[in-house]
From Swiss-Prot:
GO molecular function: nicotinate phosphoribosyltransferase activity
Family (UniProt): Belongs to the NAPRTase family.
GO biological process: NAD biosynthetic process via the salvage pathway
CDD domains referenced in this protein's UniProt entry, alphabetically: PncB_like
Reaction catalysed by this enzyme: nicotinate + 5-phospho-alpha-D-ribose 1-diphosphate + ATP + H2O = nicotinate beta-D-ribonucleotide + ADP + phosphate + diphosphate
UniProt KW keywords: Ligase, Phosphoprotein, Pyridine nucleotide biosynthesis
Entry keyword Ligase: yes
Family annotation (InterPro entries): N/Namide_PRibTrfase (IPR041525), NAPRTase_N (IPR040727), Nic_PRibTrfase (IPR006406), Nic_PRibTrfase-Fam (IPR007229), Nicotinate_pribotase-like_C (IPR036068)
Protein known as: Nicotinate phosphoribosyltransferase
Gene: pncB
Entry PTM: Transiently phosphorylated on a His residue during the reaction cycle. Phosphorylation strongly increases the affinity for substrates and increases the rate of nicotinate D-ribonucleotide production. Dephosphorylation regenerates the low-affinity form of the enzyme, leading to product release.
EC number: 6.3.4.21
NCBIfam families: NAPRTase, PRK05321.1
Keyword Ribonucleoprotein appears in the UniProt entry: no
Length: 436
């Protein structure tokens, strides 16, 4: 096993991204080949990343030389039979074009400080893979420039402590159904940290670790690639079909596209209450489960159980997947709460591949992982939004579109919440009006 937190490269191959990105790429290429989109990179942490711009840009531009190899294409055909063979074959011709697709600048904020800004524009099917790759690049460039003094042993010790805690708690609580997947690619400290973590967990917790969201590491370590769909699938539909029908149509077309093979529905693009209105009996039977990514997990889970029971569906035949910034302690509490009532599974990211414990550098600065996101902001020139079940996770640059979206889905319109969103957008140096 290596004893360093950094490898020679940041992005290892064309497969060094999250599984759900290529799933959505497949669906977009088949259903919306001409759709144009734009994404924005946002730093939520109170940390100036502007000085990282030259190295981040240089690393992103290296993507123009990345290709899907014959071995990688053969691997995807084997592990992802739900992807149409002609789509996988076409990946051999796929090329990243960051020179034209991705732009970088440092934006002056309202308080006079600077912040890194990245925008992505182009055909949806050609730009969809950038998100998790660019986030991985930003996170690792920051680690290399600012936290390269963290010793490997610090990360390893924190990881070993987590595993000891988990094993002890599973035995103490008599929990026998705890399953989780690694979902750390986007916010990993480094590629090597993610690899080290997966090597260790696959050895120490083979009965708990179900796989990883990273295709490259799944292939290298013989793990199951894990992933279904993300918010952008639902957000894009807001501009492609009648907005009130967008969530249901997105669910229906996803189900039809993959014949039920990727049947975990994401519930919080509009919010759980709006989701349940669209998640009718047919869809509830068709999807094998749902994913929680914001709001109180216990309240959400109780709502899902009640929904299934109201339709005469045994909740034990369905799976609730929890992925909202979890650590082992939080996941165990959720698992224990729902044990014997519904199947549960977890996706854990930052806590696994970007936790350095109580590390403090020589300047007295305590290490904290970055909070960064890349989200779709327009599709075919029209604004799109994520409302979320957690106001701080809401994403929209057009406050009027957001208000209309809430009205159409019969969601409460909280003016204080809108004001907070505008204040947050202003503090992040973003516009909050695309088109009036």
């Amino acid at each position: 096993m290596t004893t360093t937190l950094f490898s020679s490269r940041i992005i290892q191959s064309a497969l060094d991204f999250d599984v759900y990105k290529v799933n959505m790429m497949s669906a977009v290429a088949a259903l919306y080949p001409d759709a144009m989109v734009s994404y924005k990179f946002i730093v939520r942490s109170e940390e100036d990343l502007s000085e990282l711009l030259p190295e981040v840009k240089a690393e992103v531009l290296k993507l123009q030389d990345v290709r899907f190899t014959e071995d990688e294409i053969a691997y995807m055909k084997r592990v992802a039979p739900y992807l149409k063979p002609e789509f996988v074959e076409a990946l051999r011709h796929f090329r990243f074009n960051p020179q034209s697709d991705v732009s970088f600048h440092n934006k002056t904020m309202s308080d006079g400080s600077s912040q890194l800004r990245i925008t992505i524009n182009g055909l949806w099917k050609e730009t969809i893979l950038y998100e998790t790759i660019i986030m991985s690049i930003v996170s690792e460039v920051r680690s290399r420039q600012r936290w390269s003094d963290i010793p490997f042993e610090q990360f390893q010790t924190v990881l070993e402590d987590k595993v000891r805690y988990l094993k002890a708690e599973l035995e103490r609580r008599n929990i026998t159904n705890f399953k989780f997947a690694d979902m750390s690619t986007r916010r990993r400290f480094s590629f090597q940290a993610q690899r080290t973590m997966l090597e260790y967990l696959s050895k120490e917790l083979p009965q708990c670790l179900t796989g990883t969201s990273n295709y490259h590491l799944a292939r290298e370590l013989d793990l199951t690639p894990i992933g279904t769909v993300a918010h952008e699938w639902f957000m894009g539909h807001q501009a492609l079909v009648n907005v009130r029908d967008s969530q249901k149509i997105a669910l229906q077309r996803w189900q039809k596209m993959f014949n039920g093979a990727l049947g975990i529905a994401l519930t919080d693009t509009i919010g759980i209450d709006a989701f349940l209105k669209d998640f009718d009996e047919e869809l509830s039977h068709a999807y094998v489960g749902v994913r929680h990514d914001s709001g109180c997990p216990f309240t959400w889970g109780e709502k899902m159980i009640a929904h299934y029971e109201s339709l005469g569906i045994d909740p034990m035949t369905k799976t609730l997947v929890f992925t909202d910034g979890l650590n082992f302690e939080q996941a165990l509490d959720i698992c224990e709460h729902f044990q014997g009532r519904v199947q549960v599974s977890f996706g854990i990211g930052t806590s696994l591949a970007n936790d350095m414990g109580n590390y403090v550098n020589d300047q007295g600065e305590a290490y904290q992982p970055l909070s960064i996101v890349i989200k779709m902001v327009t599709c075919n020139g029209s604004p799109v939004a994520k409302i979320s079940d957690e106001p701080e996770k809401a994403m929209c640059e057009d406050i009027f579109f957001l208000m209309n979206l809430k009205r159409r889905f019969e969601q409460p319109l909280d003016l204080n919440e809108c004001r907070k969103l505008i204040d947050r957008l202003e503090s992040e140096g973003q516009n909050y009006l695309i088109d009036a």
